[in-house]
Amino acid sequence: MKNYDVLVIGGGPGGYVAAIKAAQMGAKVALVEKHKLGGICLNYGCIPTKAYLKSAKMYKDIKRCADFGIKVKNGVSFDWSSILSRKNKIVAQLTTGISFLLKKNKIDFYHGFASVLSPCEVQVDTNLLHTQKLIIATGSNAFVPPIPGAQEAYQKGILKTSKELLQLESYPSKVTIVGGGVIGVEFATIFNSFGSEVTILERQDTILNGMDRDVVVAYTKKLQTDGIQILNQVEVTKINDNQTTYTQKGNAKTITSDVILMAVGTKANLAGLEKLNLALNRNSVQTDNFCQTSIPGVYAIGDVNGKHMLAHVASHEGIVAVTHALEQKAHPINYDRVPACIYGFPEIASIGMTEQQAKEKQMDYKASKISLGAVGKSLADGEKEGFAKLIVCKKHLEILGMHIYAYNATELISEMAVGMELEGTAYELSQAIHPHPTLSELTFEALLGAVNKPIHA
C-alpha cells in the first residue's frame, strides 16, 4: 500500500490543477485518471471547439477580405480533414504539457479506474492507495435522454454527443441540434460557418435560457440572420435514424439531417464512489463553498458537484479545496461571481446578475448599455455589432453584473470579475485609465454611463 497526503481522482481541469497545487504546497500527491489527461474540456470540449471556431473565423474573414482592400483570386475553400488534424495537434500538445507538469511536480500518476473503498482508501487495478485527503474530480458525462429511438440512433453513430461530434471525419451538409444551450449554439456556429444547414430545437422559450434578455435577443437575431433555424418551445418526441420528430404548439413535424447532436446537458460521473454514500444534491455531490462533501476530508470539485459546469470554476475549486484540505487559509468560493463565456461571432461574456434578476429581487439598480459602435477600435477591426450592459446598485454603484455581446467579449469580462471580487464600484473602476484604441474602452464607457454619462454615446 502506498501512502499519500492528497489523492485526486480525475485528471481534468479541476483534478490536475488540484494535484499540482497540492504538490506545490509540499504534499505527497497521487492523481488517478481512467481516460485522458485534460478531461472533457481539453479533449472533447473547450479547446477543440475553440480550434474549430478559429478555423471558422478565418474562413469567414477571408471571404469578406475585400472589405479591407484585400483580393483573393479563385475564391476560398476549406479542407475538413486539415481542420480536424489541426485540432488534434493542439489537443495533443496540451495533454503532453499536463503530463510534463505532473512529472515536474513529482506527482504519482495512475492510469485506471478508481474504486473508492473508504474516505482514505482507493483501489486502482492492483494498486491499493491510502490517503489523508481525497479530492473527487470525476467530471460528468454527456446525457442522452430517454427519447424513443435516441439510444438506437446513438449506437448507430447518427446521433452524437459533443464528444463524438468533435471526431467527425466527414463534413455534414445538414445538422440538427437538440438543445440551445452553450454547446448547442457553439456547434451551430461552427457548422453554419462552413455552410451546413443547421436547425436548433430548444425546449425553453429562448436559446441560452437564463442569460440577459438583451443579449439573448441580439444573439438569436444574429444566428437567424446567418441562416441558422431556431425553433423554441419544442418537444422532441422521437428519433428514427436520421429523422427527428418534434412537436411545437401542438403541431408534429419531422426534420431529416446527416447528423443529430444531443446537447441537453451532462450528468455527474459517480461511478466508483458508491461506498462513500455521499450526500447528493440533484444527482451531484453536495458540497459547501470550500468544496467539502458530507464526509470530513473528502472534497468534490468540478462538474461532479454540479455547481457550475465550467472548466475555470473546476480549476479554482481545485485550488480552494486543496488549500482548505491542507489546513491553510482558504477563501470561500462566491458562486455569484462566476464569469461565463460563449464563443461565436460575436462572443458573449457574462458575470453576476442579469437585469431581469435585479428586477425580480426588486433591487434599486441602474443599467448602463453602450453600443460597440462607440469604440473606434471596433470600426478599425471591421466589427460593428454588439454592446456592453453594466448593472449597478443605484445608490452605491456596486457592480451587480456585466453582460457583453461583442467580438472578443470573452477577453473583456475578467476586468469585471476582478472588480466584483474586490467589491469595487463603477466609480472606482472608471478611475483606471483604459488604453486607446482598445476594445476595453467598451467596458470603460459602460462604467462612465453607470457613474454619470458616457463620453462617446
Describe each region flagged by the PLM:
Residues K73, D108-H111, S115-Q123, L129, ...:
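A Rossmann-like FAD-binding core segment of flavoenzymes
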Residues L7-I9, A114, L129-G139, V178, ...:
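Short hydrophobic core segments
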Residues E152-Y171, T254-E327:
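FAD-site-proximal beta/loop scaffold in flavoenzymes
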Residues L7-G12, A18-H35, I47, A51-M58, ...:
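Flexible, glycine-rich terminal cap/loop adjacent to redox cofactors
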